[in-house]
Amino acid sequence: MALSFVSSTRFSKMQYGIWHSGSFTQRVSVRCCEIANEAPRPKSKLQVGSPIIIVEAPKVIKTAASMPCLRANSGLVKPGDVGRIVSRKPKDLWAVRLSIGTYLLDGKYFKALELDEGDSD
């Protein structure tokens, strides 16, 4: 998706019953349009309910409770821990349910867990 900007200048002595002193107002219109040669963005594998695995231990962790608590990570969340995404927050912040509780984690600390759907023959 591309954005195009169009600038227009208006000069009017009387607008909405108010006399202006001859100054002009700058207005900008923004239009969104699809461009055919633009490659589609890949959809994230992460969504609510997706299993994840911690790849790097965060230095501080924040609980996802109604009254959140920020504390130093003293070995509570370790690389290799597995959990599920409960919800998504703005700016790549995710509420993740781990075995020790639900925490708000940045997306750089975990990745989607690839589950093998193998045949049981």
Swiss-Prot record:
Tell me where it resides: Plastid, Chloroplast; Plastid, Chloroplast stroma
Could you tell me what this protein does? Required for both formation and activity of the chloroplast NAD(P)H dehydrogenase (NDH) complex of the photosynthetic electron transport chain. Functions in assembly or stabilization of the NDH complex; probably involved, together with CRR1 and CRR6, in the incorporation of NdhJ, NdhM, NdhK and NdhI into the NDH subcomplex A assembly intermediate (NAI500) to produce the complex NAI400.
UniProt-recorded name of the protein = Protein CHLORORESPIRATORY REDUCTION 42, chloroplastic
Pfam families for the chain? CRR42-like
What's a GO biological-process term for it?
A: NADH dehydrogenase complex (plastoquinone) assembly
Origin organism is Arabidopsis thaliana (Mouse-ear cress)
Q: What is the lineage of its organism?
A: Eukaryota, Viridiplantae, Streptophyta, Embryophyta, Tracheophyta
Phenotype on deletion?
Specifically defective in the accumulation of subcomplex A, a stroma-protruding arm of the chloroplast NADH dehydrogenase-like complex (NDH).
Task: Name any GO cellular component annotation.
Answer: plastid
UniProt subunit comment: Biogenesis factor component of the plastidial NDH subcomplex A.
Query: Which keywords accompany this UniProt record?
Result: Chloroplast, Plastid, Transit peptide
InterPro entries with a match to the protein in the record: CRR42-like (IPR021495)
